């Protein structure tokens, strides 16, 4: 049956709310991952022997070259981190870097051409529909829905300093949801699930996009990361391009790579690229995410040049970078 027939059938059988939740879950679902942890502790009792114990969390793929976002507390002190994709494949993951104060961690697995969770755009509003996808209590790919209850909340989470500017939702959040995406009705990520209020119902908290981007920039800056395009001295992430801007500038692609880190003294720095520039083309080839830029740059040698097209301040610009 054609998709249009299915859509017409859905419109007849489901209300608008149900269709929004279904669409969002189907869109982000392939990029959501299960994270299994192995820890080593001490067995209680007289022998006090080492023992292994596990845990489960969630995360999502934000770059097709295997970069995964989750909570820092999910992977803290883990001896082994195993990631299971929506298609059933499993990989050992390495910790690229973390920002415990804001509960963000960046993982990487040895895979590419992976489905990616798209990032949202525009401010959230109280009352807006949001959907959480994760693995509560190990129940894989569970979908729960609710609304944004409040913005800018402050929470004292165990083992961390006060977390600020959190999104409060009434979406059902349980152990195992941590690190999973909070998405809007279009299936775009607007936050990362981080905490619930113990002994309370309808109180969940998520980390907003601005905090996530700032944490990623700090991870890249510390060199714990290996940012895509390291020959250029940049790190970044896939972001949607504003539709009005695309139309005005006659840009056909929907995504670009937003620069979150410019290495001081590196090629991109010398070319006067800036944080929050959005690269859309390199050497005449489209750039929609870090993996694209990495692939293009790797074909060049030190001393060669790469011409970048990028967006800044609503304008399309070009610059030649010497590697």
Stretches found by the model and what they are:
Residues 74, 205, 261, 280, ...:
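A structural signal for short, well-ordered beta-strand elements
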Residues 178-179, 240-250, 263-281, 296:
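PDZ/PDZ-like domain micro-motif
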